[in-house]
Amino acid sequence: MQPLYAVYLQILKNLCTDLSEPVPLDGVDPSALYRLAEKHCSLPFLLPYFEQQPQFSALKQQTKQMLLSYYQLEHFTRLTFSLLLAEKIPCFLLKGISLAANYPIPEYRKLGDLDLYIPE
C-alpha cells in the first residue's frame, strides 16, 4: 500500500477508535493528503493535519458552516418530531441513502431535508 493511503487510513482509524495520537506524515506530501481527503469528502476529519496548508482558513470556515447546518437540521428534526408526537400524530423518521430510490429525480433529494412517514 502506498504511504499516502496508509497514513490516510491510519488517521481515519484513529478517529474511529478514539486514539488521540497524531499520525506522523513521514514521506507523505500534505497537499496529496489534502486532495485525497477532499476526494473522499473527509476533509473536516483531517483538519488538524492541514494547519500549514494555504487552504486551512477556508477549510476551517467550511467545517464550521457544515457543523452549523447539521445542528440546525438536528434541531429542526427534533422540534418537528416532538410537535407531531405532542399532537399524537404517529410518524416515522426516515433516514439513509436507500431513500434516494424513492425519488424519481435524484436532485429532489437534497441534504438538509426531513423525511417523515405519517401513516393514514
Predicted regions, residues:
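Helical scaffold of the NTase/Pol beta-like nucleotidyltransferase catalytic core
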Residues: 2-95
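Active-site nucleotide-donor binding segment shared across nucleotidyl transfer reactions
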Residues: 79-114, 118-120
